[in-house]
């Protein structure tokens, strides 16, 4: 009998940041007890050259899986409400709805758009900093690598906060 793992549903922002920072291949090693997925809607948001890195994870390493979003009418309605009525992005909306109805974890750094919905529906979410924190705790990366990652992605125009990983606390998982 196959073990069904809880999924970490990656939003485009986390994929893009980890690809820019050179750590996309290590991301699935941070929580190996979870299955990492990218929804087809999110996959379509990822552009080259990052798409090449994502495809390598999906096709060659097989540690991230692409999944089609919207199995039920209920999910499709909620997605339409979030995108059309609330004006949220398609990727974030798909991830939140998927996690709500499947009891999975969202990986997103778009806190402005996800926090209220996730808290209302008791959806666990992990940010880029949370992944880095747990990566350090689980000895997948070092503090120096995490800090270098932040410096690199910020030099490319991203806005990842500098944190002190010795005092940072994350108790989401």
Describe the role of every protein-language-model region:
Residues 14, 42, 95, 113-114:
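Alpha-helix capping/helix-boundary segments
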Residues 5-10, 20-22, 26-71, 129-133:
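PIN/NYN-family metal-dependent endoribonuclease catalytic core
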Residues 18-26, 115-121:
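Short active-site loop/helix that positions an aromatic residue
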Residues 64-85:
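Acidic catalytic patch
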Residues 114-173:
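Acidic, PIN/NYN-like endoribonuclease modules and their adjacent C-terminal/linker elements
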Residues 89-105, 113, 134, 149:
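Acidic, metal-associated active-site segment
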Residues 11, 38-40, 88-89, 107-111, ...:
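Histidine- and aromatic-rich ligand-binding microenvironments
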